[in-house]
């Protein structure tokens, strides 16, 4: 299955997220400028985990994300429960978390354009990160991202590269996702922007493939290419 543009029928759009005529999934902007205090989320509508069997699908994501203005606050690839709604609009919470607590949270990989030790130290079971490599992005350039999860190894790996540039950024960690998430989850993106900083968060293309441990990998789903 392929789409040349993002297919709204296969996506759950929340908050300020829109599908534009250029095939980009973006936060809403006013008069061409990034909107302040903005939150947008978009998720694929089909769940990827069948808890009764104890099996989790593997996935791959390829994202291209430009940064056209000053840094803040970032966007994240996330797995959220089916029926999840946008959370606290505080920009540092990425639209995925209600507050800094130790309750069960989504599993997310954040592309943080505003490095802040208060929000970015290593710590499990919270908004705080379990792996935090620095990301010195060239402003306005497109980044390509690959995210993989191996259910057998319980290993989550994310890599980011600008074409023709180095280095790769390779955070990884062992995550027992079946212990962190409920029975049904959906994959997608969430992005926020604060009151003062200015940037937009665009997903230019997104491909998705998954398989159960005992099955052959699916051909793949290009939600936009």
Curated annotation (Swiss-Prot):
InterPro entries for the chain: ConA-like_dom_sf, L-lectin, Lectin_legB_Mn/Ca_BS, Legume_lectin_dom, Leguminous_Lectin
Kinase as UniProt keyword: no
Any one Gene Ontology molecular-function term assigned to this protein's record: carbohydrate binding
Keywords: Lectin
PANTHER family: CONCANAVALIN A-LIKE LECTIN FAMILY PROTEIN, LECTIN
Sequence similarity: Belongs to the leguminous lectin family.
Name this polypeptide is given: Lectin
Species the sequence originates in: Vachellia farnesiana (Sweet acacia)
Lineage: Eukaryota, Viridiplantae, Streptophyta, Embryophyta, Tracheophyta
């Amino acid at each position: 299955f392929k789409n040349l543009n993002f297919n709204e029928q296969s996506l759950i759009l929340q908050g300020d997220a829109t599908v534009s005529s250029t095939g980009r999934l973006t936060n809403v902007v006013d008069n061409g400028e990034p909107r302040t205090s903005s939150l947008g989320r978009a998720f694929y509508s089909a769940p990827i985990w069948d808890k009764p069997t104890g099996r989790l699908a593997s996935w791959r994501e390829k994202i291209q994300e430009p940064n056209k203005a000053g840094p803040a606050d970032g966007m994240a690839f996330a797995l959220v429960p089916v029926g999840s709604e946008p959370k606290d609009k505080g920009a540092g919470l990425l639209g995925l978390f209600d507050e800094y607590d130790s309750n069960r949270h989504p599993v997310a990989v954040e592309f943080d354009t505003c490095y802040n030790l208060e929000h970015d130290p290593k710590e499990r079971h919270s908004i705080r990160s379990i792996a935090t490599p620095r990301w010195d992005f060239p402003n306005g350039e497109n980044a390509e991202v690959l995210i993989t999860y191996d259910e057998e190894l319980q290993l989550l790996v994310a890599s980011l590269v600008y074409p023709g540039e180095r280095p790769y950024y390779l955070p990884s960690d062992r995550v027992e996702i079946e212990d962190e998430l409920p029975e049904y989850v959906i994959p997608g993106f969430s992005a926020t922007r604060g009151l003062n900083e200015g940037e937009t968060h665009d997903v230019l293309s997104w491909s998705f493939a998954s398989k159960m441990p005992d099955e052959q990998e699916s051909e793949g789903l290009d939600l936009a290419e």
